[in-house]
Amino acid sequence: MITATLKGIELRLETAPGLFSPRAVDAGTLAMLSRVEFGQEDKVLDLGCGYGVVGLVAARLGRAERVWLLDQDPAAVELARANLAANGAGASTVVLSDGFRSFFETGFDKILCNPPYQADFAVPKHFIEKGFNRLAVGGTLTMVTKRELWYRNKITSVFGGVKVSEVDGYFVFEATRKTTQYAAKRLKPRSRVGS
């Protein structure tokens, strides 16, 4: 059991040794939360929720029934459900899914993610590309990582731009869905002279 006060909300959280950051709320998650404001009507997705910190904060600051939490780990999903119930946000929805593969909800105002650090970027690529499609036009993807260049380039290629903030050694990326198509698909092909 850990305790944390986030955005003025005191939380008691059950964790487990096999999950990410079981002894304290991760510094990257804290950095990301420092850049986000939740509104009462926001439809929010905590993508890769772990034991549910981000989704729980969103549910307590907004309306719990407008918050979804998603993770591929059954233990994380179970703990997220328990933590939501124990902290007065049991109306939120927790889903077991490998990324968006078994999750089809759309129209999110905010998708927040602290993706796993891997060498091949397959997971964050999936989260960015499929996350774009799950946002409402005007919705925002917020991600936090320790690496900047790949994420900046990938998010820009999908969203057409990204705001990057450095917070306590982490990079927080905020990108807004402005249209219905990826930025790269909106670019017109260049004509080649002499070919």
Show which residues each predicted segment covers.
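Class I SAM-dependent transferase core
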Residues: M1-G39
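Conserved SAM/SAH cofactor-binding pocket of Class I
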Residues: A27-C113
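Class I S-adenosylmethionine-dependent transferase superfamily signal
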Residues: A58, G131, I155
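Short beta->alpha hinge that forms the Motif I/post-I loop of the SAM-binding pocket
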Residues: D71-P74, V123, K146-R147
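Conserved helix-to-beta-strand junction in the class I
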Residues: N87, N133-L135, V158
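A short glycine-rich, Lys/Arg-flanked "PGG" loop and its adjoining helix->strand segment in the class I
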Residues: K125-V137
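Conserved beta-strand signature within the Rossmann-like core of class I S-adenosyl-L-methionine
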Residues: G138-T145
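Core SAM-dependent methyltransferase catalytic element
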Residues: D168-S195
